[in-house]
Amino acid sequence: MRQTIKYEFWVGLFLLLGIGALVFLGLRVANVQGFAETKSYTVTATFDNIGGLKVRAPLKIGGVVIGRVSAITLDEKSYLPKVSIAINQEYNEIPENSSLSIKTSGLLGEQYIALTMGFDDGDTAMLKNGSQIQDTTSAMVLEDLIGQFLYGSKKSDGNEKSESTEQ
């Protein structure tokens, strides 16, 4: 009887450790920093095309993650994608004239937003909660690039043929 209780205790402990490890790995994979919220401020930007950008996509400066996409909506007036970005509070010295562009990690990787710092000449305001970044560059969609390449090559083939027939 005593041996059975000891055996059940160790099996239960092992099971709890396994469940804890799975929860830990799940949070790491989901890129969740824990249950405590990091202090951040939110800025918005409007793009012509966001491609496959998703909520929780990283905001990076030089490859370093400084924030995440918190929401993606459609602007009611212009019908363009409006992206809300939560920037970690420790990065509060970003000039308002900075620019955003949507990039892709690798050829077919996840999309992220790259922030290029603007200049700070003393009179330039810094981003704060509710600011809007005006200078944006939309995502380059792979299908569009392939279409342009194919269309461009057909056009040049057609021009070459017409030039050779004129001679």
UniProtKB/Swiss-Prot annotation:
Top-level taxon: Bacteria
Subcellular localization, as worded in the UniProt entry: Cell inner membrane
Membrane-topology descriptor: Single-pass type II membrane protein
Keyword entries, A-Z: Cell inner membrane, Cell membrane, Membrane, Signal-anchor, Transmembrane, Transmembrane helix, Transport
Pfam families: MlaD
Stated role: Part of the ABC transporter complex MlaFEDB, which is involved in a phospholipid transport pathway that maintains lipid asymmetry in the outer membrane by retrograde trafficking of phospholipids from the outer membrane to the inner membrane. MlaD functions in substrate binding with strong affinity for phospholipids and modulates ATP hydrolytic activity of the complex.
Similarity-based family: Belongs to the MlaD family.
This protein's name: Intermembrane phospholipid transport system binding protein MlaD
Organism: Haemophilus influenzae (strain ATCC 51907 / DSM 11121 / KW20 / Rd)
